[in-house]
């Protein structure tokens, strides 16, 4: 079933929910989080351990994810997002603020970021890629759909763009394109 928290939630141990988890305020999880349905956090979210979501993930504030992240559905972030572990999404990812991925990122749908974006590991996008701020991609990049950068872009690794590329600022590719 669904669990609803009417305020902030601060959990010290592992969190496992068999259905959907709604938190109207901030959510702080000091260990692993497993939710078989959707996870919705109205405020900021911090997860110290690994996160596995069977449905969609939605966060209304700044997000700090320190472990691996696996989401079966779409992920939406209304603030900045920082992910330290590997990220795997079976849907789309939309972040209105800046996004920092300190490991590999795999998104089967579209990846849309409104602010600056930094990806330290390899990035694979099954749909379109759109970034509104300056972009720094430090490893290989593979994008199946259209790719658009509204500001400067710097890519250090090999790049495979299977559809069109639009860049609104300076573009620097340090490897094969």
Regions found by a protein language model. Name each.
Residues 1-177:
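Intrinsic low-complexity, repeat-rich intrinsically disordered segments enriched
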